[in-house]
């Protein structure tokens, strides 16, 4: 919908490799933005916006793949501010936000979007079933229109069966207990992994300690 050959997309460094592959399939150029413990660094982001004039900023703000880091509240506000200041689209990919073990939920970048430049993409595959490839988008009506047209041109529509199954799952109230089970299970796996890293990896090895999600960075 938005990408043309030669467009620049700013991405976190590191980021989800499959997204980079998709962007490059449409002949876009991906430029990495430095990160620290609070996610994408805003000074580097603004400098690269000024230098490369990107079409889009791609960010995974919560429990990022692959680092496990979470973009801080102030930086979420700043991303929205820079998006408005330089008129750059933001693709906020946020499929891990509901898999939280501790800490407070942070509002999406979209909450601070004053000009309609932020598009949120989310997924049911992480919280319902990995085999059910369903997701959703939150965006301005015009953007939804173009995305719907593009979706129709690729495969007409997503199969109705997984859509109905997912809808009924939530409608019948199964999600709260399922969500608790998921978080308990993944928390145990995180703790076991970090314990093994501390015990068996070479002395001096450092790792992130994510409050949720499916990733840690060693």
Indicate residue ranges for each PLM-predicted region.
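Conserved glycine-rich beta-strand-loop-beta hairpin in the small C-terminal domain of fold type I
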Residues: 167, 184-194, 204-218
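Short beta-strand->loop structural element characteristic of the AMP-binding/adenylate-forming
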Residues: 10, 29-37
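Substrate-binding/gating loop at the entrance of the active-site cleft, primarily
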Residues: 11-28
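A short helix->loop->beta-strand "cap" motif at the edges of active sites that frequently abuts
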Residues: 7, 28, 55, 85-89, ...
């Amino acid at each position: 919908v938005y990408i043309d050959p030669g467009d620049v997309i700013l991405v976190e460094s590191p980021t989800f490799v499959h997204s980079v592959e998709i962007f490059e399939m449409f002949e876009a150029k991906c430029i990495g933005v430095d990160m620290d413990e609070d996610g994408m660094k805003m000074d580097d982001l603004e400098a690269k916006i000024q230098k490369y004039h990107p079409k889009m900023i791609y960010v995974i703000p919560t429990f990022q793949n692959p680092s496990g880091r979470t973009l801080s509240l102030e930086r979420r506000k700043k991303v929205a501010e820079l998006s408005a200041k330089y008129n750059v689209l933001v693709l906020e990919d946020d499929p891990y936000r509901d898999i939280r073990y501790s800490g407070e939920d942070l509002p999406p970048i979209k909450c601070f979007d004053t000009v309609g430049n932020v598009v949120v993409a989310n997924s049911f595959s992480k919280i319902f079933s990995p085999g059910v490839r369903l997701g959703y988008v939150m965006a301005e009506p015009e953007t939804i229109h173009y995305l719907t047209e593009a979706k129709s041109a690729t495969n007409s529509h997503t199969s109705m069966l997984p859509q109905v199954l997912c809808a009924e799952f939530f409608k019948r109230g199964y999600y709260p207990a399922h969500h608790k089970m998921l978080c308990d299970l993944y928390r145990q796996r995180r703790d076991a992994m970090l314990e093994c890293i501390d015990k068996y990896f070479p002395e001096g090895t450092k790792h992130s300690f994510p409050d949720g999600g499916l990733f840690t960075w060693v």
